Design a protein with these regions (language model features):
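Serine-dependent carboxylesterase/thioesterase catalytic core
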Residues: 42-47, 52-54, 58, 64-77, ...
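C-terminal catalytic-base region of ester-bond hydrolases, centering on the histidine
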Residues: 174-227
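Alpha/beta hydrolase fold serine-hydrolase catalytic domain that processes acyl esters and thioesters
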Residues: 2-24, 144, 151-154, 171-176, ...
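A broad, low-specificity signal for short, low-complexity segments enriched in glycine/proline
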Residues: 3-8, 32-33, 67, 136-145, ...
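Surface-exposed loop/turn and secondary-structure junction residues enriched for glycine/proline
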Residues: 25, 35, 52, 78, ...
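Flexible, membrane-associating and regulatory peripheral segments of lipid-active enzymes
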Residues: 1-44, 50-52, 56-61, 66, ...
Length: 227
């Protein structure tokens, strides 16, 4: 089956949906507070394309409050391989620095989830588990409305044989536990390429922009971490 990018209607709804999430966030405080408590493990959150640690501040703050030790990725703005290196070597070094007391759980938003999976494939000894949030790792990257922006921002061509080979490796079964949080109403990436048959998947109702702020997503992350 050939998968296509989300519809123009879903794409056009992205900003209004993100604004609605922010405007109504307070309504969900009781449900957020009732989520399972954490076990103190170290969690690193990797931001999406062209985003920084500021974009994951709400998620990190929430997970800190319920009992986890969270960290941003500390690499500035995410511009793909221009930021982390072709084999994510700079991100691996950051994870290694946090893993002195034991493997780290990686949560990646969109492109950040693809990077988290690459780290887990290359250095499974450093990674306890991977949670991806709206990360299009499991199918054609052209089943998105942002693939041209990806090529421009990262300097990579999606049809480059080396990029295709790396993408195929990232999509392969992980050597650590994994969960993919995805939405079929995502307006930027086709939700069907954000999860696969080999791993655990959790479907939510969300757009793509600001997905890491969505209370339903935060609760899904908390429940996944609690296992």
């Amino acid at each position: 089956m050939v998968l296509t990018p989300p519809s123009k209607a879903l794409w056009a709804a992205e900003l209004p949906r993100a604004a609605w999430t922010v405007a109504t966030w307070w309504r969900h405080r009781p449900a957020l507070a009732a989520a399972p408590r954490g076990d103190g493990r170290t969690v690193m959150i990797v931001p999406g394309l062209f985003n920084t640690d500021r974009s994951t501040a709400v998620m990190r703050g929430y997970l800190n409050r319920i009992g986890y030790r969270t960290s941003g990725w500390g690499l500035g703005r995410n511009r793909g391989v221009r930021t982390v290196g072709v084999e994510a070597e700079r991100l691996i070094a950051r994870v290694e620095s946090l893993a002195a007391a034991g493997p780290v759980t990686l949560i990646g938003v969109s492109l950040g989830g693809i990077m988290a999976r690459l780290v887990a494939h290359r250095r499974p000894d450093l990674v306890r588990a991977v949670i991806t949030v709206s990360s299009p790792y499991a199918g054609s990257p052209k089943a998105t409305n942002v693939w041209r922006a990806f090529e421009w921002l990262t300097g990579e061509r999606l049809d480059d044989p080396a990029v295709v080979l790396r993408s195929d490796a990232i999509a392969g079964p992980l050597p650590v536990p994994s969960t993919a949080i995805w939405s079929r109403s995502d307006g930027l990436v086709n939700g069907l390429i954000c999860h696969d048959a080999a791993g655990h998947a959790v479907e939510v109702r969300s757009g793509h922009l600001g997905v890491q702020l969505k209370p339903e997503v935060l609760i899904a992350v908390a429940k996944t971490l609690a296992g």
